[in-house]
Structures are given as C-alpha cells and as structure tokens.
C-alpha cells in the first residue's frame, strides 16, 4: 500500500445535519473534544473571556448563537483523520448547506429525542438521498424527557424513508437515564454526566443477564428486558452494505450536553463510514488514490478574518496530494497558479498547510477569480458534476439608502452571490436589483454583511416573484422569440445566466406549456 493510499484510507469526511436546536453545535464541540481538539469544549477564550461556540464565528452568528456559515474542522481520532463539516442549522439557511453535502462521503443526523424528525431534517435528508449518502443517526437529549424510542425509530423510517437499525438502546431517560445497552455486543454503558471539557471514564457492565446489570437497572430490569425483546423482534439489524448504499441508518442514543454517546457515533463513522469515494467528473471518474491532484470548490466564504479583507475558497480534494507551493491548473480559466498558502481549518483557527490528501478540505485565498464549482488539477481538464444552484424561494427588491453607493452595492452583492450567501438578479427591463434566498434569515445576513464589510446600507421591498427558473433553449430562433415575448419577466443572474422570474405558479405553468422548446430549470450546475 502506497503512503498515499494509506493516507486516503485514514480519512473520514462527514457533515452534521439537524433541525435548529437539536443540539448540533454541542455535538460538534464534543466531537472535537474526542479528538482533543478543544481543551474546554465550547470555549475559545477571548480577552473578555466570553464563551462562544467554537464553530460559530461570524458576527451575526455570535449574536444569535446559531451556525449560519459552514465551518470545517479537522482533527485526529483513533489513527484516523476526521474532516467534520458543520452545516448551518438555523431555520433559515442557504443553499450553502446543500452544497456542503456535495463535499462529504457520509453524514451524521442529530435528532432531538423530545421532538423527533423535524422539517429541516427532512429537507437535508432529501439532499443526502440525491447522492445516496450513508447516514449515522444520533438521538440526542436523553438527559431530558424524550418520546418513546420505538416511536422515534418508526418515525425515522416512515418520514425519512430509510431503514433504522438501533445499535444502542436507552435505559430510561431524564432523571432516570442510566445509560445505554449495546444490542449486538450485550453490554451496558453506564451514564455519568460529563459536562464541558470533562471526558469521563466509561463504566461498562458486561452481560445483561449479570447480577451487576440487575442491580444497576433495579426495578426497571424486567420491563427493560421485555422492551428489548420487542425491539429485537421488530427492528432491522445493521447491515454494512445497506448503510453504504444509503438505505439503512445505524441509530445511537445519548446526550451531547452530558458528553455521553458521542464517542459511539464517532466510532461508527471510523468503523463503518466510507473512506473518500471516487468522484464523477464530466470526462471520467476520478479515483481518490490517483497520483495526480484534483479538487473542486464547493463554497466561498468572504471575510473569514475581519483583520484581513479576504475571501477563502473551500476545496474538497478528490485525488492526489496537495503539497505546499505546488502548481495547479485553474481549469475554468485555463491558467496555472502556484498555491503556497493553502489553509487547513480548525474552526476559526487557521493554519498553513504542508500537505493534504483526498477527502481533506483545504482553503485557498481568493482574490475574486475563484467561483463555486471551479476545478483545480495538475493540468487535466476536468469538471466535477453535481454542485448545483437551487432556485430561490423568497425574493426582495433592494433599495439603497445612499444612491451614490450603487457601485459598492453591486460589488458587494456580486461577491456575496459568488459565495452562495444569496442570489442576485438584474431584470432586463429596469434598473432594479432583486435578491433571491432559500430562507428569510439570508436577507438579514446580506444586509448586515453589506453594512459591516462594504459600508453600504440597504433596505428591502416586497416584489411579486413566485420563483425563478434558469432558461435554456437549443433553438436560437425560438429563444429569441421567447425573449421578445417574455422580456417583462426576464433577468440575468449574478453569473450572467438568463433567468425567468415567474410572478405566480400559474404563470410559470402557462409559460412552460406555451414554450415547449424552452427549458425552465429549477437548478443549475455551477460552470
């Protein structure tokens, strides 16, 4: 096995998906703690010594305590290298989240044991299903009142259309939470709360039939054994292949806040989740063990460091090895660039990188030339597929408070659109600027970032747009006819693509019927 193949085999790259408030930020911190990456989970002490979650860094995130931007963290665990991508958990997230899921090989779904499957989880699972991403599930908050665990498993299966195979089973909950029982290996892991940075030593009781197990469960023993028989009779058994194919999810129970059960999940990722997978490019399939470097950009983040007005492009390495100072071909521009200062991420801490392998996420300094979906190789012309733009669901017209700043506004919006914080449309028949978003919070984020980073103040006005569709037509003459007829509703997006802004659902249906040769697309690939 070559050194490169050995390095690839060590990698596990996964994202955490959850509904807001299911405990995602807490579990992220505890995972980092497992890799001893944070000394006190949740504390990166600033001079004021205020506690902010380690992976929530943008000003607005600090104020609201939610992760709006995708963070990337790398840490070692059990001779493996873990790349953890944190996705925005807030009610209103952007397509940033969807795109992050194109850069991982597996995902960890966190559910609130008191609430079960929630709307945002469903949306994220739909995206995972597009790529058959393997999912590990963690039912959180067992230190509080939770719903009946069997009911929770039924809900996962019915709503998320995936088989659920419990690996551990909870013994009580809330004040009576005594730990979990490992179904396949017949042992109990005793619950002792470890808060903050405490890593408690795990106490294990072998064999449910033992006197020690009976003493630990007390009066609950008979009822628990009865429940287990029911569970083992009714639930799916874990099957590695079905998990890899995205058809079955292993389910673990615990409490991230109490620092219990998180290590079981991380062990599952190391033991069962796939190492970096082959990636499909337009030209061919790229294998991770190949010698030549290839990677794609799935996200651009502006101003990660207020001290430097910089933008960072996040790249997933698909094959080969990055070495400091190496020459790469920026395929879209056909230009060779020397990259001497790629970054690795440990949340807001960044370090210069000497080398990286397939599965790793690295950061490139971007001075406006890199776009989402761009490919970098050692010369080969490759373009990776499946990094989509999604049609926005909400629209606002932008009004500038100071008309003299229209240049700064356009520049700011162009940059924010490039990094996926919003989508911007310029109607053909007016000088309006229209913003599109997947969630309302995106508009707030854009306004506050325009103000902080570009010194532009703007307000929003409602606008009658129901949805956007990207336009394509092979027949030039037909396209011209369509453009003349539909000019009132046509716009160009930030990437220069022709877009139809449909005022109503009915209008869109009519247009699609009237113009069968014109393709109205709800997603568009980054080119």
Curated annotation (Swiss-Prot):
Increases the formation of ribosomal termination complexes and stimulates activities of RF-1 and RF-2. It binds guanine nucleotides and has strong preference for UGA stop codons. It may interact directly with the ribosome. The stimulation of RF-1 and RF-2 is significantly reduced by GTP and GDP, but not by GMP. GTP binds at residues 18-25, 86-90, 140-143. InterPro entries: EF-G-like_DII, EFG_III/V, G_TR_CS, P-loop_NTPase, PrfC, RF3_C, RF3_dom_3_sf, RF3_GTP-bd. Its main location: cytoplasm. One of its GO terms (molecular function) is GTPase activity. It is found in: Cytoplasm. Signal peptide: none annotated. It comes from Pseudomonas syringae pv. tomato (strain ATCC BAA-871 / DC3000). The keyword Nucleotide-binding applies. CDD domains: RF3 (cd04169), RF3_II (cd03689), RF3_III (cd16259). Belongs to the TRAFAC class translation factor GTPase superfamily. Classic translation factor GTPase family. PrfC subfamily. HAMAP family: Rel_fac_3. Keywords: Cytoplasm, GTP-binding, Nucleotide-binding, Protein biosynthesis. Residues 9-277 form the tr-type G domain. It comes from the Bacteria. GO terms for biological process: regulation of translational termination. This is Peptide chain release factor 3.
